[in-house]
Design a protein with these regions (language model features):
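Predominantly the C-terminal beta-signal and adjacent terminal strand-loop region
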Residues: 76-80, 87, 149-192
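Transmembrane beta-strand segments of Gram-negative outer membrane beta-barrel proteins
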Residues: 20-33
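Hydrophobic membrane-targeting alpha-helices
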Residues: 13-17, 100, 148
């Protein structure tokens, strides 16, 4: 009997959960603009700006508070004094907690803060050069969702993500490399 009542209660809750529209999925185009820092300083070391597609999912815990998981990957060229040292990919999944101001009007601004875990792969640098394969760092964001349909939104977003790794030559550490990009995004979101 208890199992039957539980099953009926769960089934009855499904329409409420669906109507609540607790999820949002966005697809964005990102411009990743590294803010390169080295320590000790390596003059002229740079990481290229790149565009990439991104998908993210936001779960709304309350109408004002959401948790967003950002998924994107990018291939960057690393240069020294304008000369190519090679290329590397990084995958920085980022989880942020967001506060959405005025969650009911057409224009819905938000701010967020969180963490990222970055893994480097397909590292193809000059002979002997390597980078660490992982990095943990913080993330800040601000953005706005602009309603264009009942559940569809144009999204503008900016993030600052802290990504650090070590550059090594033959196993000897040369410098700490902070890629630390500012990430500009524009896209479309659907709330469901």
């Amino acid at each position: 009997m208890k199992k039957t009542l539980l099953a009926v209660a769960l089934i009855a809750a499904i329409p409420t959960a669906v109507q609540a529209e607790n999820w949002m999925m966005r697809v964005r185009a990102l411009d990743i603009v590294p803010d390169v820092k080295t320590s000790p300083t390596v003059a002229g070391l740079d990481v290229s700006d790149e565009w990439t597609p991104e998908v993210d999912f936001t779960y709304f815990i309350t109408p004002n508070i959401g948790m967003e998981l950002i998924l994107a990957t990018q291939r960057h060229e690393v240069t020294l004094g304008g000369a190519s040292l090679g290329k590397l990919n990084h995958l920085p999944p980022t989880l942020t907690v967001q506060y959405h101001f005025n969650p009911t009007p057409t224009i819905k601004p938000y701010i967020g803060a969180g963490l990222n875990y970055t893994t480097f792969y397909n590292v193809d640098l000059a002979p002997g050069l390597t980078v660490d394969k992982h990095s943990f760092g913080g993330a800040l964001q601000a953005g706005v969702d602009i309603a264009v349909t009942q559940n569809g939104y144009i999204n503008l977003d900016v993030k600052k993500i802290w990504i650090e790794t070590e550059v090594r030559n033959g196993g000897v550490k040369l410098t700490d490399l902070g890629i630390n990009p500012i990430v500009w995004g524009i896209g479309y979101g659907f709330r469901f």
